[in-house]
């Protein structure tokens, strides 16, 4: 599988249709389906992730999260969405200067665990586990490389995912460090309608973008202006059935140990509304596509990048 700026430009051209390009050339081309998979889509997702415009879980599919991340990147950089702006977009993304797929050797630490055989759905059963660990090396690597497990299998059809094995992975390492370098006076805005979170710098520029899942009919997002009150890495989850409309009231309150498969993922950012916050999730593939119990859920890696940018007192806006 070879990636080139020419290959990527094919996806950009397709995106022009999806964003309403008016050129006759683009209009005559069929848009890729949300389930289409290919090198152009994968490269675009990797480049957007490296630019801090996340499409959530990298899966190589031209779906909703990818299209909207690309549109947000274009808007933030003053780039039109038509086919004529393709060259400028490719340059802004760094196409051709970074290999989207690189080799990685699975380390002994990657394979050491500890791992859970399975993660029970019931909170009481989860509370009996010493940690909400990954269930496999594959799941751990998927989190490390911001990817769907199915993508890693597709890139490495013969891999056993064991220590010492060399595999092909999305080139996203270092994205967290790049985000951390921008820490400063920022503001978070979450749009319920768009299902996205954006971080703005003091000049009003978007410096981070990611899809989210926020609220539901039963647990609406608390619209308004708030602030971050605490940032907790690897949080212990205090499960209280009284806070959930769909919980069995007979269930007891329990503490669920930390870990990437904890219900709130690897980081919790509380706001000055009781029981509400921004957090990670063990279900990266659902982000942007489902509802939540009122809070703002993100992939674990995106939540980590937001946590690197904020501090107590950071303004947070929840809007419709």
Where are these regions (language model features)?
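Secretory/export targeting leaders with adjacent low-complexity proregions
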Residues: 127-209
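Solvent-exposed, polar/charged alpha-helical surfaces in well-ordered, non-transmembrane soluble domains
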Residues: 42, 46, 64-72, 87, ...
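Acidic, Ser/Thr/Pro/Gly-enriched interdomain connector segments
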Residues: 2-4, 23-57, 99-127
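Bacterial N-terminal signal peptides
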Residues: 9-20
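A short amphipathic alpha-helical interaction element
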Residues: 34-82, 142-147
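Extracellular LysM carbohydrate-binding repeats and other cell-envelope/extracellular binding modules
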Residues: 64-110, 153-183
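Sec-exported extracytoplasmic/periplasmic mature domains
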Residues: 49-53, 71-79, 94-98, 143-160, ...
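Gly/Pro-biased beta-strand-loop elements
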Residues: 175-281, 308, 312
């Amino acid at each position: 599988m070879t990636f080139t700026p020419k290959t990527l430009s094919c996806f950009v051209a397709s995106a022009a249709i999806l964003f309403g390009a008016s050129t006759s050339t683009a209009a005559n081309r069929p848009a890729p389906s949300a389930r289409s998979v290919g090198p152009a889509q994968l490269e675009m997702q990797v480049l957007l992730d490296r630019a801090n415009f996340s499409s959530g879980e990298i899966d190589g599919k031209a779906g909703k999260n990818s299209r909207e991340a690309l549109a947000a990147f274009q808007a933030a950089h003053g780039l039109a969405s038509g086919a004529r702006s393709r060259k400028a977009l490719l340059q802004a993304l760094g196409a051709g200067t970074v290999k989207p797929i690189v080799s990685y050797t699975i380390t002994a630490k990657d394979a050491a665990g500890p791992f859970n055989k399975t993660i029970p759905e019931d909170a009481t059963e989860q509370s009996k586990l010493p940690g909400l660990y990954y269930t496999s090396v594959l799941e751990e690597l998927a989190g490390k490389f911001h990817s769907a497990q199915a993508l890693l299998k597709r890139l490495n059809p013969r891999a056993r995912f064991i220590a010492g094995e060399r595999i092909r992975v999305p080139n996203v390492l270092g994205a967290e460090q790049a985000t951390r370098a921008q820490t400063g006076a920022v503001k978070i805005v979450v749009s319920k309608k768009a299902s996205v979170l954006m971080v703005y710098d003091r000049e009003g520029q978007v410096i981070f973008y990611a899809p989210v899942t926020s609220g539901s009919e039963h647990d609406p997002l608390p619209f308004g202006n708030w602030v971050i009150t605490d940032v907790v890495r690897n949080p212990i989850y205090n499960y209280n059935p009284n806070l959930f409309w769909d919980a069995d009231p007979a269930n007891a309150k329990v503490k669920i140990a930390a870990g990437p498969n904890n219900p709130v993922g690897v980081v919790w950012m509380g706001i000055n509304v009781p029981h509400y916050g921004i957090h990670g999730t063990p279900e990266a593939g659902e982000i942007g596509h489902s509802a939540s119990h009122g809070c703002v859920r993100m992939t674990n890696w995106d939540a980590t990048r937001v946590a690197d940018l904020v501090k107590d007192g950071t303004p947070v806006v929840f809007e419709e």
